[in-house]
Amino acid sequence: MGTGWRRAFCTTAPRNSDAAAPDLDKQRTGYNLTPSPSPRSCVKLAFLSGGSNPSTPRSTSSPSLRCRTADAQTPTAEQTSTPRSATKSPRLSLAAISNPSSPRSPLKLSLFRNSFKFRSTCGICLNSVKTGQGTAKYTAECSHAFHFPCIADYVRKQGKLVCPVCNSIWKDASLLVPHKNATESPLDDSVSVIQEKRVVVTSSPRAKPRPKQSDYSRFYDDDEPLLSPRFVTIPEADENCGGEEEDDVPQFKGFVVDPNPSFAVKTNEIPVNGRDFGNVQVSLLPEAAVVSVGCGYETRAVALRVKAPPPLTARGGVGRRLLDPSQRAPVDLVVVVDVGGTMNGAKLQMVKRAMRLVISSLGSADRLSIVAVVMTVPKRLLPLKRMTEHGKRSAGAVVDGLLCGQGSNTSEALKKASRVLEDRRERNPVASIVLLTDGQGQLSKVHTNQRSTITNVGSTRFAHIEIPVTEHGFGESGGCSNAPAEEAFAKCIGGLLSVVVQDLRIQIRVGSGSGPCEISAIYLCNGRPTLVSSGSGSVRLGDLYAGEERELLVELRVPSTATRAYQILSVRGLFKDPSTQEVVYGRDQSLRVPQAVRSSSSPRIERLRSLFIATRAVAESRRLVEYGECTSAYHLLTSARALLGQSGTVEAAEYIKVVEAELVEVQWRGQQLMEYQSQHQQQHNQRRRGSERETTTTMTLMDENGEPLTPASAWRAAEKLAKLAMMKKSDLHGFENARF
């Protein structure tokens, strides 16, 4: 009677009795080595242990599940010998909180209690994170709370943004990113930003491994942000409220827009930095060529030259002064360095010196990226980074680490450079790509005094922005490190960086007081021959560097009765100021077309005629190829080649090669188009045969009522036929031997 209440509880023992036998002595002395919770913890979680008595010792000597009874009021020595630190240890895992062997252990409830515990306590130091204790609190995306110094120290040591409690990946942890990147070197941080993101994803043991991204699916949007914009203070209402501001307000002239607005520039619109951005020179060459004579009219060709103004520092004659960042707009520059098999020894050293010159010439507002042509896969060694002191040190370390490799793929490197500029998040007013190579395997050199349609300057356009691609070759004499070569390279880089005209547009029309004539077409000679306008209209030339020239070929159609009259062309344009991004309107200029002579042996006129024939043929053939008319394009180029061959001059022979090269390309495109059409026709025929076969099969599987033929419908049809046969037989019963 005095023993008090007794409680029955269930315990589990391991299956291996031999391994559990040596542990009996330790259990008797008060040390519990089983994964079951301690007696003090079972008191707190009695509802999870099935009502067990915390004062009863547990035995694991038996390999079976059995019940025991113990006195609830008599404390044993084994209970008192349990360490207090072990009973109040806050580091209780999920296995220690809930007994998985008990049939009454609610796993969901234990998970909820576990998650609720880590919301009110720090997941690292396991102390309370309640407010008012003088320590900042950080709550992660997974709802786990931490002390900010604890989680910052954890991220700094581990180098990854993963929850230490549930191992979930944190996507939005902007406060912890500086602590994650604190121990990384500046060069590694600037070179492998995208690789670090992959490491974070794959470092979590619960994260699924992602397939490696290909080079073409990678986005280069890790460019360094631009300088913070300057805030311009807005004056109050009582400041500068003179009567002069009211005079500058234009009067309302009605809702009818003037079709011919004035493009004159006011004196206060011209920048005050010493450069006259409105001084874009537009002139006609002093010769005009008669291309063809038709019934009642003749076709003439004139060349229009557009030249950008030179920079102010060019007057001093010092090439390095062209690189002054204060005299130009900020630029995003991508340098493609060829470090193939031919760029070894002295050439590689000269490339490094040129790169150091480029780095030193850029300012803090400029950004630089480096792409190396290595083997067949180009590599981006440096993202778009502002050329501050830290950025210049990072770029210099990349340049010093350049080594000569084997093979080169310049076209893929230029594609990657274009991707770098396409994927950038922020944009400077000017963007440029520079290719540094020895020139071997690239475009062949052209003669200096030749008006060739293929030059060393091309352009890659995207999103209405022109990215000029410039190739600077070192040639066989690349090892000669003399001062004039570096001075010439400094002038070249200075000209590339000094964009003085941006998004230039020119409108050409017949001026007032001109003789009867008509503008048939306008062709662009520089780069790829292109039809930029059919008739009078606006011509977009894009960005112009300091002192850069562009040539346009204007096709005029003059009546035969007005061949002796003077024709006048009116030219006006507009562009953006690269430094201020303001639109500058140019003044109207009237240009007098020179008189053309039908029969002339002048080399300049013959060269102009040959240039016009080749440019027009190439431009029109490309336009026809875009519409899929390769045969017409081939006949057009063949006629142009025959027409150039009739003159027999040296100038015509040079342009015949250009037309023949275009003929080869048109033939190749025609073959590709024929193969595509044949494959498309075969696929169409296969689809049509398949549809006919399906239609035939469907028709054969239909009954007389148009319903699909199934076993049930076939059985019903057979029953119907059997009934009809029986009815006919019954109707003829008794008339077998009858004669009618």
Swiss-Prot record:
Biased amino acid composition, Low complexity: 49-67
Reaction(s) catalysed by this chain's protein: S-ubiquitinyl-[E2 ubiquitin-conjugating enzyme]-L-cysteine + [acceptor protein]-L-lysine = [E2 ubiquitin-conjugating enzyme]-L-cysteine + N(6)-ubiquitinyl-[acceptor protein]-L-lysine
Pfam families in UniProt: VWA_2, WAV3_C, zf-RING_2
GO biological process entries: gravitropism; hydrotropism; protein ubiquitination; root development
Top EC category: transferase
Region Disordered, annotated ranges: 14-105, 677-709
Gene Ontology molecular-function annotations: ubiquitin protein ligase activity; zinc ion binding
Tissues where the protein occurs: Expressed in root tips and leaf primordia.
Keywords: Metal-binding, Transferase, Ubl conjugation pathway, Zinc, Zinc-finger
Ranges of biased composition (kind: Polar residues): 71-90
E.C. number(s) listed in UniProt: 2.3.2.27
Consequence of gene loss (knockout): No visible phenotype under normal growth conditions, but mutant seedlings exhibit enhanced root wavy growth and curvature in response to gravitropism.
Domain VWFA, first and last residues per copy: 332-476
InterPro entries (UniProt xref): CLCR, VWF_A, vWFA_dom_sf, Znf_RING, Znf_RING/FYVE/PHD
Zinc finger (RING-type): 122-167
Subunit structure, as described in the record: Interacts with SINAT1, SINAT2, SINAT3, SINAT4, SINAT5, TOR1/SPR2 and FIP2.
Role, per record: E3 ubiquitin-protein ligase involved in the regulation of root growth. Acts as a positive regulator of root gravitropism. Possesses E3 protein ligase activity in vitro.
Classification via PANTHER family: CALCIUM-ACTIVATED CHLORIDE CHANNEL REGULATOR, E3 UBIQUITIN-PROTEIN LIGASE WAV3
Name of the protein in question: E3 ubiquitin-protein ligase WAV3
Organism name: Arabidopsis thaliana (Mouse-ear cress)
